[in-house]
Amino acid sequence: MDKNTGITGIIRSELALAGGALTIILVSVFGSGWFGDLSNPLWYGFLFGWLFCIMLWLAFNVVRHADCLAELLGEPYGTLILTISVISIEVIMIAAVMLTGDNNPTLARDTLFSVLMIVLNGMTGLTLLVGALRYKEQVYNLKGASAYLGVIIPLAGLGIVLPRYTTSAPGGEVSPLMAVYLIIMSIALYGVFLAIQTLRHQSWFKQPATEAGGEAAENMHGDLQVRSLGYHALLLPLTMLPIIRLSKKMARLVDHGSGTLGAPQALGGFLEAILVLSPEAMAAVRAALANQLQRTMNIALGSSLSTIGLTIPAGLSISLFTGKTTE
């Protein structure tokens, strides 16, 4: 029997979930003492590194289950599940910081900027480079990329740029009326795009047929142990649960680092972006190396769009219900 198909294989593949559960138990029992005094930089660094590594490990396993679902369901649903699952982690972390920490009005905006810069410049550029070095020339569906950019640009303009030019509130603060408008527009635009991607124009987001003489796309999921649809559909949210639980403690550490240690407030958004995007970056690079540039574009541009489409409504809704300002 294959060692990866039995109970032992399942246990081995879900060690991250076990590590997350153990961390939750330890934090629940000893958390009040461990997180009560963070004045020691070494102790603070240890706690931050521990939680960051555990949450990153869990995030990679979320991506693994999403990749298995992608193999079972096909495109564009596979990439859609991947991007929404991973970006949901980011939204949860932002919500945790906003609800548990001191008022940080620019956190959501800093995270949006970080994600857009990392994805549209770093991740996309890296995947194009490694794909070109291996295959010289790759193809993707331009209509799909244009559809992504056609929604990313207005959403970014509305959510990041427009509040700086309105006079209803000082600086970049979002007034209640503007917040309601941005929530409705973000949900509407993102919803229309999802309808285009999953219903009307699915072919725009699938890998084009390889031209005669070109290299065929490889199976990038060959090293995955794909089990049943129900198994991965259950384990994906279960693997996200420890991240949700630990995000409150991580929020406290980020808030302490931004305040007490004098770190810039934008650092919190950058760290959250790195934590969330690292697994997706690996998936995008694997797709490029497998000559599936369309999946790479779906992951990269889908991450940017999902970030804006989900973070803006979530952040502004929390701001409206809690009374905390958002810029």
Residue ranges and their predicted role:
Residues 1-327:
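Hydrophobic alpha-helical segments, chiefly the membrane-spanning helices
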